[in-house]
Amino acid sequence: MPSLDPIPTTLSDHCRQLGLVHTAEALNDLIARATQKRWSPAVLLEQLMQAELAARLHQRVERRLTDARLGRYKALADFEWSWPTQIHRPTVDRVFTLDFLAQRENVIIVAPHGLGKTMLAKNLVHQAILAGHSARLLTAADLILDLTSQDTARALHRRLRTYLRPSLLAID
């Protein structure tokens, strides 16, 4: 006969068994605060759920940032807008609203080597993730190498689907 998990004995254990890990961690502090501030049970439950949702959102963003493979990059705030003079700031600002994602349009950044295309792409991926979108960055060389290394048409099709999954795929 298969063994059953031990029966939870505390409220924190119940939370963990239900998958509410962050609630289990915050439970004692929030109960103490609720007692001190004389919260109603509904307010306490709302605070617990807000803490759980906030922690899950933070975890989701962190996971997406890791999956995006951004590496190190210069923040957009540090970009030197006066050089190159050819860059059209209003266009870049419009791209960073991410409206093109909802419209399912493409953005292509074309410029000579060393003018900040990669930095803009990394910041765009970062911005998309913070806005709740899935996003990934990779080089064109890595993409081609990966796709050409697939042994069968089925494997290639499966790999293509992984690249089509994110809302934003930035190819440098």
Q: What are the language-model segments listed below?
A:
Residues 163-172:
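Conserved P-loop NTPase "ATPase switch" module shared by AAA+ and STAND
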Residues 85-90, 136-164:
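Short glycine-rich substrate-engagement loop in P-loop NTPases that contacts/grips substrate
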Residues 104-107, 124-127, 131-150:
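Conserved post-Walker A coupling segment in P-loop NTPases
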